[in-house]
Amino acid sequence: MGESIMKKAKEDAPSVDDSKKLAIEQAMSQIEKQFGKGSIMKLGSDSAKQTVQVIPSGSLDLDIALGIGGYPIGRIVEIYGPESSGKTTLTLSAIAEAQKRGGVAAFIDAEHALDPSYAKKLGVNIDELLVSQPDNGEEALEICESLVRSNAIDLIVIDSVAALVPKAEIEGDMGDSHMGLQARLMSQALRKLTGTIAKSKTVVIFINQIRMKIGVMFGSPETTTGGNALKFYCSVRLDIRKIETIKEKEESVGNRVRVKVVKNKCAPPFKQAEFDIIFNAGISREGSLVDLGVKHDIIHKAGAWYSYNTEKIGQGKEAAKEYLKNNPEIALTIENMVRDLNSLPLLVQENNKKSRKEEKLEQAAG
């Protein structure tokens, strides 16, 4: 009798694997409750992706790599890389996307290097863009906090962390030592900003530069400016690098860049995106569609020829890009097929027509 009861109890008891799974789920639930959603997830799981609202990055490749379709609203994002790698282009593209959706954007230009004509070429409505050129780091971060607290701004870009020079350093003499001042300033500002950003549903993008650590024997000698606080407070960190120069008849017309998602608290990290940035035009949408179309077997490549639905669309990538530029309906269909395969929201035809109409009006005005 006693033996049969014990046998039945053993059969009813969950297996070791099941009990472990249950314990892990409870631990993950407790961690998320304590530290917030996205603090822990299974690396390869689609369920790890949160249903967060986003502002598209302006690059379909990058939206896919981010896993959620853009920059998460109410979070801090850091974009860093070497000079002339496309950091400002990436942020201006995001500003254009935010404005297209009726949002308000601000650009805190601590480097005093924003080119309005270039911003306009990337689709930024410069008449509606709020711009500030602060004198010191404290002023820049206070302006950022005031804008966030207004609850009316969708996207704020700070260019760049390296240019956020503390007031004491500006007012001091050239040879004075100001060790750790900027790191302290960033740490204090981010402690105040993080909670406010989440409540106001603003995306704050910090552009950062790369520096070399002296005396590093093992590992990467590269580091970003402004101390460690920004690394911790960011939900997304992007490392952008130029990988090759795009040439047309021996003339440089753009750069191909690779963006690594170094940190992502909204979806599994470590994904990469490669796309073209054309000089004076920005991120090449058609170039991305050709690359992604081939990758997802929507566009077929045989030798140098590209074809879509058995119809040849061009010999060489440039010809295929030109075909998609001249046939926006087909380009939209291909983009929506790519979006559908990557679980991103689809675009509607009306939006596409509206944006083309706006482009014509801008050309007429120019």
Curated annotation (Swiss-Prot):
Subcellular location: Cytoplasm
CC terms in the record's Gene Ontology section: cytoplasm
UniProt-recorded Gene Ontology molecular function terms: ATP binding; ATP hydrolysis activity; ATP-dependent DNA damage sensor activity; damaged DNA binding; single-stranded DNA binding
Residues that coordinate or bind ATP: G81, P82, E83, S84, S85, G86, K87, T88
Pfam families for this protein: RecA, RecA_C
PROSITE patterns noted in UniProt: RECA_2, RECA_3
Gene3D superfamilies named among the record's database cross-references: P-loop containing nucleotide triphosphate hydrolases (3.40.50.300)
GO biological process, one term: SOS response
Biological function: Can catalyze the hydrolysis of ATP in the presence of single-stranded DNA, the ATP-dependent uptake of single-stranded DNA by duplex DNA, and the ATP-dependent hybridization of homologous single-stranded DNAs. It interacts with LexA causing its activation and leading to its autocatalytic cleavage.
Protein name as it appears in the record: Protein RecA
Primary gene name: recA
